[in-house]
Amino acid sequence: MKIKTIYIYLLLPVIVFAFTSCDDKLAEINKNPNATENPQPAYLLSAAQYHAAQWFMGNDLNYNAALLWDQHWAKIQYTEPDCYNVTTSSFSSVWDDGYATIIADLNAVENSNLGNANYRAVAKIWRSWTFLQLTNLFGDIPYSQYAKKVTPAYDNQEDVLKGLLGELQTAADSLKSTNGSVSGDLIYKGDITSWKRFAQSLRLRIALEIADRDQELASGIIAQLYANRSELISSNSENADFVFTSSPQWNPWASAFSTRDDQRVSKTLIDKLKEYNDPRLPIYAQLPSDATVTTYQGAANGLSADQANSQGFNKLSRPGTYFLKDNAPAVFFTYSEINFIFAEAAARGIINADAQDFYNKGITASLQQFGVGDNADKYLAQPSVAYDASKWAEQIGWQKWISYYGQASDAFTDWRRLGYPKLKAGPSSVLGKGQLPRRFFYPVTEQSLNGSNYKAAIAHQGPDELTTRLWFDVENKNR
């Protein structure tokens, strides 16, 4: 059994050192003549990308947390996570896989002796994406000391986010076609220009994320990237995604629904798509299997098992067949998001641009991404959809949230940052007072294996509770 904990990885050199007095022949005996002593960067990069795609769309991060808490899906059986009834062990695999599998592999690529700076830059960019996911889910996290100390200190989220801005710029600057090809890249197939665009697009995302806390820094970065928009993801063909193949390397949603049937599309999402006469509805959801139900029906969030059962499992909509295909992609960044960021930046006066134009482009890009963009103008002309500057946050919030379907943790982050859409807790929530989760618990292993740094983190950030706001999640947003 593979133990995926950072401390095991970090203790290996200590264990090896302790046995250096043993006969050198022992090492020779234990060598596998058919094994690769130093895994190749191409293999490690492929593994890190595949594991990240599984992690991003998988069980503990997605089905039992972000997909429910952002109200894209709802539970109809085993409803505890949908009622926020989770424990400090619920997110251990999110933490462990993020650090000891994905980031560990990327560190190995970056630290390899291969004389190819592009490999190191791509690894740095993908590692930055992983750190961004981790800090947005947990808050303060080990960052600057990770893999350098057995018990790494936690960096404040502010320092993590600003550190990632710098790392991504450094990586983008070092990517050059003359540095060599990048094999094993399952996202952009070694295309250096695409990786530069992805790096700068991530910087744009982070800049907006910190805008409520450090407006000067955020505004400068957003304005600079707006002036150099050609350096960003500029079409759906440039989206960052990972295309799965077939079993056993298949899309996690397809895998889950092949053996279980305890999730449905949320009533929150389906009702909003109906309100908007949204052509993405038959892409996002299926008609219920009960032939007597002729319209799409969502499941309510936050119900007890008995309450959920009373809705009728076969009277509710499963996720759309597009998302349940073996080879459905994991999507990490889209052209739609770029446009919504600039729409918000224009509405807030950060850039001198037409917020309505970027809002419309964001919606159109999402419709086209899912193959239903032919009647975009008609959709945009509806009173319920047409841009209203006095309601910019609400409108951008809803449309961006819809476009994030399949990117649950990103939707969860943006909802906390922007304050829209206005989601409501279900009747069986264990949090009380209508509260909603705003972060993940730290894994229980942090308390036992890295206790002093864990305590320092919660002393700085606040209690290790689901309702504790992270640094970027300002309470009084004044939208």
Question: What is the role of each PLM region?
Answer:
Residues 1-10:
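Bacterial N-terminal signal peptides that target proteins for export
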Residues 22-72, 76-77, 82-85, 89, ...:
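Membrane-proximal, proline-rich intrinsically disordered regions
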Residues 16-19:
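Bacterial Sec-type N-terminal signal peptides, specifically the leucine/valine-rich hydrophobic h-region
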Residues 38-42, 73-372, 389-393, 478:
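Structured, solvent-exposed acidic/aromatic patches
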